[in-house]
């Protein structure tokens, strides 16, 4: 498989579906924001995308809703509609069409180059009522030991 690297700016995102169709690997370098904590660290981790042949609940996807690129987890699919939510978010979702999903994250890449497959987040999604406290502990722990 050939490597095709794409930066996560809006101008280059239009290339993602074409690169994936050509069988290339698309890596979004150092994603911004903290909405996917603790699984993807903004400004630190990169993600590798694959073609979105079948999107399912639990997948982490790159979507463009209303011209805005988002890397979040799928929490619901209803027909052709998909609902996303960041793992680090306590509330708020994004809704759009499945056709707006450009790619599925199949690897999370740390700065050391270590790759790991994203989990389905099933347990994390069920912890939504206590996620606020878990994220607070995570952030404090990270400040002390990072």
Q: Where do the language-model regions lie?
A:
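Extended hydrophobic leader/signal-anchor segments used for secretion and membrane insertion
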Residues: 1-146
């Amino acid at each position: 498989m050939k490597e095709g690297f794409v930066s996560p700016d809006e101008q280059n995102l239009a290339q993602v579906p074409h690169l994936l169709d050509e069988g290339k690997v698309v890596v979004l370098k150092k994603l911004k924001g903290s909405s996917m904590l603790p699984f993807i660290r903004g400004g630190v981790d990169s993600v590798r995308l694959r073609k979105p042949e079948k999107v399912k609940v639990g997948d982490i996807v790159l979507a463009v809703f209303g011209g805005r690129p988002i890397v979040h987890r799928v929490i619901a699919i209803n027909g052709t509609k998909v609902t996303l939510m960041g793992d680090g978010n306590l509330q708020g979702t994004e809704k759009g069409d499945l056709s707006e999903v450009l790619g599925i994250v199949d690897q999370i890449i740390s700065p050391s180059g270590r790759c790991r497959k994203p989990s389905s987040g099933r347990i994390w999604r069920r912890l939504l009522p206590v996620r606020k406290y878990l994220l607070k502990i995570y952030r404090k722990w990270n400040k002390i030991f990072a």
